């Protein structure tokens, strides 16, 4: 199985769930950028302090700062396989990630696109019951995904790295399809 993966897909497609399952089964390190940011802040590292100051102002953490955190994590893995989830979110970030991986003598082996119909995504996200998950907010998040993140599909497809996995059905059914596509 591939050892350096990237997950992309719309909110509610099950990226976090499937990433956790795959990493546990295959001994990969799950690098979720949201979790990495929170971990750096909790640890009080220099990068964490910088990220915390930005987040406390209600601003988005810069691409450079996220890249620095990703670099730090990848360097610490000493060759262990990884799955990157939540970054890159746009083509500019993907273009910035490539030279970083080159410096570390690593590369993305496969990009997994979890695909799902919008109506199913909306139903899933509403069923989670999060306070900020109302239908208009969810539809706005899907639109932001289409504008910013969806161009990554073409970017990675042009590089021959993209595989699509149907993310409809049960968690187990999706995992089965995912495992088969990565075999």
UniProtKB/Swiss-Prot annotation:
Keywords: ATP-binding, Cytoplasm, Kinase, Nucleotide biosynthesis, Nucleotide-binding, Transferase
EC number: 2.7.4.3
Main localization, broad class: cytoplasm
One Pfam short name: ADK
Gene Ontology terms describing biological process: AMP salvage
Molecular function as annotated in GO: adenylate kinase activity; ATP binding
CDD domains membership: ADK (cd01428)
Stretches for region LID: 127-133
Main EC class the enzyme belongs to: transferase
Residues engaged in binding AMP: 33, 38, 59-61, 86-89, 93, 130, 141
Alphabetical list of Gene3D superfamilies matching this protein: P-loop containing nucleotide triphosphate hydrolases
Any Gene Ontology CC annotation: cytoplasm
Pathway it works in: Purine metabolism; AMP biosynthesis via salvage pathway; AMP from ADP: step 1/1
Domain remarks: Consists of three domains, a large central CORE domain and two small peripheral domains, NMPbind and LID, which undergo movements during catalysis. The LID domain closes over the site of phosphoryl transfer upon ATP binding. Assembling and dissambling the active center during each catalytic cycle provides an effective means to prevent ATP hydrolysis.
Name by which UniProt lists this protein: Adenylate kinase
């Amino acid at each position: 199985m591939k050892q350096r993966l990237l997950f992309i897909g719309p909110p509610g497609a099950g990226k976090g769930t499937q990433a956790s399952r795959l990493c546990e089964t295959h001994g990969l390190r799950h690098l979720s950028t949201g979790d990495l940011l929170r971990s750096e802040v909790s640890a009080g590292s220099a990068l964490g302090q910088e990220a915390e100051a930005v987040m406390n102002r209600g601003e988005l953490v810069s691409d450079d700062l996220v890249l620095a955190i990703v670099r730090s994590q990848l360097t610490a893995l000493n060759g262990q396989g990884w799955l990157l989830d939540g970054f890159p979110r746009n083509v500019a970030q993907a273009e910035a990630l490539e030279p970083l991986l080159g410096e570390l003598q690593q590369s993305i082996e496969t990009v997994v696109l979890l695909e799902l119909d919008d109506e199913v995504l909306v139903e899933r996200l509403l069923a989670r019951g999060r306070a900020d998950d109302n239908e208009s907010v969810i539809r706005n998040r899907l639109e932001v995904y289409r504008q910013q993140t969806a161009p990554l599909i073409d970017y990675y497809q042009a590089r021959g790295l993209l595989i699509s996995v149907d993310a409809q059905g049960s968690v187990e059914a999706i995992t089965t399809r995912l495992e088969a596509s990565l075999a």
